[in-house]
Every structure is written in structure tokens, then in C-alpha cells.
A protein has these predicted regions:
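Preference for long, well-ordered alpha-helical segments
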Residues: 114, 124-164, 318-359
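Acidic/histidine-rich alpha-helical segments that form the ligand environment
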Residues: 83, 88-133, 286-327
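Secretory/endomembrane lumenal or extracellular ectodomains immediately following the signal peptide
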Residues: 1-45, 69, 79, 151-238, ...
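Histidine/lysine/aspartate-rich catalytic loop segments that bind and position anionic ligands
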Residues: 84, 262-271, 276-284
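Short acidic alpha-helix initiation/capping motifs at coil-to-helix transition points
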Residues: 20-26, 56-60, 95, 104-112, ...
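Alpha-helical scaffold segments that form or flank carboxylate-/histidine-based iron centers
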Residues: 8-14, 41-55, 121, 126-131, ...
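Conserved alpha-helical segments that form or flank metal/cofactor-binding pockets of metalloenzymes
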Residues: 45-78, 246-271
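Short alpha-helical scaffolding segments that buttress acidic/His motifs in well-ordered protein cores
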Residues: 16, 30, 46-51, 81, ...
Length: 362
């Protein structure tokens, strides 16, 4: 997760050695998620530990536990989590951990009534920060478990621990930034909205309007997405089939609509799009291999086997399999970010989806 031990590079970074830009971008996103934003790193790490426990990721849990041990507050939260007794935690911490559990188990993160407890304890910027953290660690747990990465010996060595200091409504659960607010935010916002190929103004996706509440995370996420495009081993339709399958599996309305728009732009026929919502009969054999893997990674990450990944590698090769995995993990993050925050879909996206399916419901 970090580089607190000099010269130590985590296995999740070395696993991406053939794609150094992606490795650097994921490490940068991990740093931004934990150390940037309005929330203290400790509460985000405690939420990350809950994600790791739910997803049975020993690798992620070991890294997070090591980082929690670097401060008194972190050690206190770790003791509570290890004992299973959260009653002595302050209310805001209990609410954050309950939200992390809910968002990991269901991208919609409970009812609006349940979410009010989150809103009573945290402001919009803090909610975006926490949601991004939970989304990222759902990304990371799936990535490291799919590759069966071993925990590094230095992570487990106490002597290596560094020292340190302390029902859906139509509106989103957080307020989206307006064009005027984005315009005065400074360089991070401009980097996101003015990058090559980016949309801006009224066309800026609502996911970015929300994420820009924590500019460092928004910039790190944008950097990762740009780096991922450089792998380019998958054809665009297969990549979108993966993200569509993950979003459908999670029941994420916002992301599903966006994938349909992307597939239509590639020229996928309405007939195939209609068939895709019923079953996989319209997919090619190659697409089915990718989609089957992505669905299992999404619904049962701890049940993924070496044979599952070998099947993917057999069809796509080492680099292509890694790209399928990264695409599925990307939407483990984004489904939780957009659906957990109940972000409304943009009017044009809704209309494009309605043109295909005759409804704006999944």
C-alpha cells in the first residue's frame, strides 16, 4: 500500500512490471486514497481492513494491519476490529465501518434511510473520500487474490513496521460540483477536465463531478485510467463487455448505462444489446471467457481459483488476461463509487439507454 520501508516494493506493484505506467498509477492511487482527502488515514484503513476481511484477502489485510500499527489511533482501531467489539468506538467510526461493510456487500450500500447515519456524521467531501477508499480496496482485494499474490515477508515482520504519528431518490447522496465550482478549484480539477479526450462543462460525467470533491483522488483515478489505455491488448468491445457484465452483476444502473453508450458508439447493434441482458448467447466464445471470469471475480472473489485465471490466460495470453482482470477490478471500484453515492445518470446517457431498451430501468 505504501513505501514506508525503504527499498521495499509490494508484490501488487511488481505483478505489473510489464506495464510500469499502470504499476505507478495504481501505487499513486493507493497513496491518494489513504493519505489524501479530508478523512484521517486510520479510519480509511480500518474500512479497508473490513473490505479485506469480507473478501477474504489475507494479502490486503496484512498490509492494512501493518499500516494501522503505525499510530496510536490506528492501533486502537485495530484492537477493536480484531476483537469484533465496536461498541467502544465513537459513533462516526462505527458508522464508517458499517458503511464499508454495506458497500462491499452491495454496491447500493443500503437504503437512503440507513445512509442518513453517514450523512449525519460526515460532510459530502468526507463521504466521497470514504466511498473512494472502500471502492479502491474492493478493487485491490480482487486484483491480488486473482493473482494469488503472497504476502511479503517484510510486511509480516514487526521489526519492519515504520513509526508514525496519528430506496433510491432521484438526487445523489452527495451534491455534485457545478461548472462554476470546478472552474475555481485549481490545477487538479483542470488536469482532470482538460486532459486529451476528456469531456468538460455540462458533458462532464457526474462521477467526476462527485470525485472532484477530493481532487487528489480524482487526479490519481484519471491517471490510472489513462495508463490502462496503454495496455491495449483487448479489443474495445471485449473490454466493454467485461465492464457491462460486472456492472450488471452488481446491479449498478449508472455504470451499466455508460457501458451501453460505449458499446453503441462502437457499433454494437441494438439486437445484440437486447440479447446481452437476457443471456450470453450473443457473445463470442472469447467474450464469454472474459465475462465468465469477470462475473466470478465480482460475485465471489475468494472462490476464484488458479484454474480460473489459467483459463483466462489460455484465451488472452499473459498481458490480455491482466487487462481483463484490471478492467473487472476497475468497475469493482466504480460501481461502488457511483451506486453507493446514488449518482444520477446524465440525461443524454439515460436517453441513449432508453433508445435501446425502451426503459430507464435495469
Amino acid at each position: 500500500m505504501d513505501y514506508s520501508v525503504k527499498g521495499r516494493v509490494p508484490n501488487y506493484v511488481t505483478a505489473l512490471a510489464t506495464f510500469p505506467d499502470v504499476a505507478q498509477a495504481i501505487a499513486g492511487l493507493a497513496h491518494a486514497v489513504v493519505h489524501e482527502g479530508p478523512l484521517a488515514p486510520e479510519i480509511k484503513l480500518a474500512a479497508a481492513l473490513r473490505v479485506a476481511q469480507i473478501n477474504n484477502s489475507a494479502y490486503t489485510a496484512a498490509h492494512v494491519q501493518r499500516m494501522l500499527r503505525t499510530s496510536e489511533r490506528g492501533r486502537s482501531l485495530l484492537r477493536n476490529l480484531e476483537s469484533g467489539d465496536l461498541s467502544s468506538l465513537r459513533e462516526a467510526d462505527r458508522v464508517a465501518l458499517t458503511y464499508a461493510d454495506a458497500l462491499t456487500n452491495d454496491t447500493q450500500a443500503g437504503s437512503d434511510a440507513e445512509f442518513r447515519a453517514v450523512q449525519q456524521n460526515y460532510g459530502d467531501d468526507e463521504i466521497v473520500d470514504l466511498t473512494a477508499a472502500v471502492g479502491f480496496f474492493n478493487y485491490l482485494t480482487r486484483f491480488v487474490e486473482a493473482l494469488a499474490l503472497p504476502v511479503e515477508s517484510w510486511v509480516l515482520d514487526p521489526a519492519e513496521t515504520p513509526s508514525g504519528g496519528e430506496g433510491q431518490s432521484d438526487a445523489g447522496r452527495v451534491a455534485l460540483l457545478s461548472d462554476e465550482e470546478i472552474a475555481v478549484m485549481g490545477s487538479a480539477a483542470r488536469t482532470v477536465t482538460e486532459r486529451p479526450g476528456a469531456t468538460s462543462g455540462l458533458a462532464l460525467p457526474n462521477s467526476q463531478r462527485a470525485m472532484l470533491r477530493v481532487p487528489a483522488i480524482s487526479l490519481a483515478w484519471t491517471t490510472l485510467n489513462t495508463a490502462l489505455k496503454g495496455i491495449n491488448k483487448l479489443d474495445p468491445e471485449t473490454a466493454l463487455q467485461v465492464s457491462f457484465a460486472v456492472s450488471m452483476e452488481n446491479g449498478c444502473r449508472y455504470c451499466t448505462m455508460h457501458q451501453v453508450v460505449g458499446l453503441r458508439r462502437l457499433g454494437v447493434s441494438p439486437a445484440k444489446l437486447l440479447a446481452m441482458k437476457k443471456d450470453d448467447a450473443s457473445l463470442t466464445a472469447r467474450e464469454r471467457v472474459a465475462v465468465d471470469f469477470a462475473r466470478k471475480l465480482t460475485s465471489s472473489p475468494s472462490e476464484l481459483t488458479n484454474a480460473d485465471y489459467e483459463s483466462l490466460r489460455g484465451e488472452f495470453g499473459d498481458d490480455g488476461a491482466l487487462e481483463v482482470l484490471l478492467e473487472a477490478c476497475r468497475f469493482a471500484f466504480m460501481n461502488r463509487f457511483t451506486d453507493g453515492l446514488r449518482l444520477p445518470s446524465e440525461d443524454g446517457t439515460v436517453q441513449a439507454y432508453r433508445d435501446v431498451y425502451g426503459t430507464d430501468k435495469l
